[in-house]
C-alpha cells in the first residue's frame, strides 16, 4: 500500500440532523478529511443495504451513516429502521469478505458539529489503518 494512499469514504447523512451537523462543522471551520464525500438523504431510515454495497462496488473503502438521535427522528422511526437494517447489512458484508468495521454509524444532531468532525476523523483514521477495501477484487459477488 502506498504511503500517500487516501481512503475513499462515502457518508450518507440525514437531512434533518447529521447533514445539519456537517453544516455546523463547516460554519465553525472544523476540519475533517477532504476525501470524505457526503450524500444527503432525507432520513437514515431511507438508506438501504444496497446503497452501502453499491458504494463499496464503486470503490469506497469505508461508509459512514449519520442519523437523528433515537426518539428525535423527523419521520418518527426512521433511525430505528436503520438500526434493524444494519444487522442484515453486517451479514451481507461478512459473506462478501468485507470487514463490518468499514461501516460506521452515528447519531448526530444539527447542533453537534464537533461530534460530526470527530466522527469523520475517526472513520478516516480507522479506514486508513485498515487499508483499501478488498471488494474491488471480488466485485462480481455483489451482482449475484
Swiss-Prot record:
Cofactor note: Binds 1 [2Fe-2S] cluster.
Nucleus is among the record's keywords: no
Enzyme class, first EC level, given as a word: oxidoreductase
Pfam families, sorted: FlpD (PF02662)
Keyword Membrane applies: no
Any one GO molecular function term: oxidoreductase activity
Matches recorded under InterPro entries: MvhD/FlpD
Enzyme nomenclature, EC number: 1.12.99.-
Spans through the membrane: none
Keywords: 2Fe-2S, Electron transport, Iron, Iron-sulfur, Metal-binding, Oxidoreductase, Transport
Cofactor(s) needed: [2Fe-2S] cluster
Induction: By selenium deprivation.
Family, per entry: Belongs to the MvhD/VhuD family.
Assembly notes: The F420-non-reducing hydrogenase vhc is composed of three subunits; VhcA, VhcD and VhcG.
Protein name: F420-non-reducing hydrogenase vhc iron-sulfur subunit D
Gene source species: Methanococcus voltae
Amino acid at each position: 500500500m502506498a504511503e500517500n494512499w487516501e481512503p475513499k469514504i462515502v457518508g450518507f447523512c440525514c437531512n434533518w440532523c447529521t447533514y445539519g451537523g456537517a453544516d455546523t462543522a463547516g460554519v465553525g471551520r472544523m476540519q475533517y478529511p477532504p476525501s470524505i464525500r457526503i450524500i444527503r438523504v432525507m432520513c437514515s431510515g431511507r438508506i438501504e443495504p444496497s446503497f452501502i454495497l453499491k458504494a463499496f462496488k464503486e470503490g469506497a473503502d469505508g461508509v459512514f451513516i449519520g442519523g437523528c438521535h433515537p426518539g428525535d427522528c423527523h419521520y418518527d422511526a426512521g433511525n430505528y429502521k436503520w438500526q434493524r437494517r444494519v444487522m442484515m447489512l453486517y451479514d451481507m458484508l461478512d459473506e462478501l469478505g468485507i470487514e463490518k468495521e468499514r461501516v460506521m454509524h452515528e447519531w448526530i444532531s444539527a447542533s453537534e458539529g464537533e461530534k460530526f468532525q470527530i466522527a469523520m476523523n475517526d472513520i478516516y483514521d480507522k479506514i486508513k489503518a485498515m487499508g483499501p477495501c478488498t471488494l474491488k477484487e471480488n466485485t462480481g459477488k455483489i451482482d449475484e
